[in-house]
């Protein structure tokens, strides 16, 4: 059967030349998309950059809202989900499809943020700041631990690995698989200014529902990193980030695996407090951060007990 797909880009229309590079990359694919669909947030003007064949659809603004869509415009078996600041080599999509089918996958992801290539000092910073650890594995690209943090393969010798999470910038899905994940049920997280971890929610939900998520370390896809250029006040950002990460742990771990996850999360919190206290003692960190982290944790706990949050459908209910 002939492989056909539609490309779906989420954007605010502000990525400029990086967005144009994304469009041009799609046009130059060895297997070009049947449609290039651009889902732009309501209230934003259409980008001036164009290749003349893309179709625009206005949708509600949000990292999840602009991804968790019914995709009524898609009339192919496969859908390529993209951010608006990528370069894809001409054979990238063809390789994604071949890798997916040859490994019996349901979704194929490009590893656009190569953690394993970071410097030793950067990896050490991730361990102490966000609890992200390197790991050795012949099977997994990323694993989600019981405390809600992820571990990454520190020495991927093979190109393609199974995964429990992935970067969301570039992924090829079977459309029916994506719809079955019901990512729209996670739109609650768009209430926050910027829902960090939304890609973890998407791919871990697919994994927990029995779908085979793959990551290819050799795909020629480059993240050009347009960014929004908008940064919240540090205090608000820290509080929100801690609250979001608590809720992601609550949703992906506690709800799915039960109380066995609680000791791991407590150890994670204690480690965060100890590290913050040490930095405060050494006067190398903002003395207010620990207080903000505690406020963020309290905020997350309060939200987890709200009727609106408790009414969300089960995370791993297939």
Task: Identify what each model region corresponds to.
Residues 58-74:
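Glycine-rich, basic loop-to-helix element that forms the pyrophosphate-binding segment
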Residues 63, 144-145, 152-173, 194-195:
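A recurrent flexible, glycine/aromatic-enriched loop bordering the glycosyltransferase active site
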Residues 204, 208, 212-288:
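Active-site-adjacent helix/loop segment of glycosyltransferases
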